[in-house]
Amino acid sequence: MFVPVTLELLMGFWKSIQVFALTLLFSIPLGLVVCFGSMSKFSPLRWATRTFVWIIRGTPLMLQLILMFYGPGLIFDLPAMPRMTATIVAFSINYACYFSEIYRGGIESIPQGQYEAGQVLGMTKAQIFFKVVLLQVVKRIVAPMGNEIITLVKDTSLARIIGIYEVIWAGEQFIKKGLIWPLFYTGAFFLIFSGLLTILLGKLEKKLDYFRG
C-alpha cells in the first residue's frame, strides 16, 4: 500500500510545486513594481499602492483565493477563471505585496549618503541603484525573503479551497479507505522540501556574507 500512496501523494505534490514555482516567478518581479509604486514621489500613486498593499496583507489569502475564483462570475457575470489561473493570480498578488514591503525596507535601509556619493561621481539614478544599492539590498533581504518563501511552501495547501488537487487533498482521499497515516505522510513532503529550501537559502546568505555594506 505504501507505493500506491506515495505515487498518489507525488501527483498532488507536483501540483503544489507548480503553484509554488509559478507564484515565485510572478510575485518576485511584481513585488518590485509594487515597491516602486509605494515609494513613488507621485502622492496619489504612492497612497493608492500602499492602501492596496495594506488590504492584501490584512486579509486572509484564503479569502483572496475564493474571491479571485468566484468573484468575477458573481459580481460581473463573467465566465469563471480556470482554477489554476485563479490560484496563481491570487497567490502572486498576495506574495508580491509582502515582497514589496521587504524590498522597500531594504532600499530605505541604505544610507542616503551613498546615493549622494554616487551623484557626486556623476552616476545616473539607474547606475546608483544597480551598481551601488542593489547588492546591499539583496544582502539585507535574503533572510526575510527566505522566511516568506518557506511560508509559501505551506500556503500552497490553501489551493484545495478552490479545487486544486494538491498533496494534502491527495492524502485526505485515503481517509475514505480507512487510512489516516497518508495524511501524516504528506507532512514529510513539506518538511523535506522546506528543509532543502532552507539549506539553499542559508548557502546564499553565507555567499553574500563577504559583503558587509
Language-model features, listed with the residues they occupy:
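Transmembrane alpha-helices and adjacent helix-loop boundaries
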Residues: 1-213
